[in-house]
Swiss-Prot record:
Similarity field: Belongs to the PsaJ family.
Signal peptide region: none
Pfam families linked to this entry: PSI_PsaJ
Protein name: Photosystem I reaction center subunit IX
InterPro entries the record matches: PSI_PsaJ, PSI_PsaJ_sf
Statement: the UniProt record of this protein carries the keyword Transmembrane: yes
Domain of life: Eukaryota
Functional note: May help in the organization of the PsaE and PsaF subunits.
BP terms from Gene Ontology: photosynthesis
Lineage: Eukaryota, Viridiplantae, Streptophyta, Embryophyta, Tracheophyta
Membrane topology label: Single-pass membrane protein
Main location: plastid
CC annotations in GO: photosystem I; plastid membrane; thylakoid membrane
Amino acid sequence: MRYFKTYLSAAPVLSTLWLGALAALLIEINRFFPDALTFPFF
């Protein structure tokens, strides 16, 4: 279990999870606001 926790704290794993979450967030924003160069509700 100690080696598994060491693996999960590795930088490549954390950066992959972070970039995956960021990509999912951008995809969802583009799904609700397609091609929004300006946001008209400001």
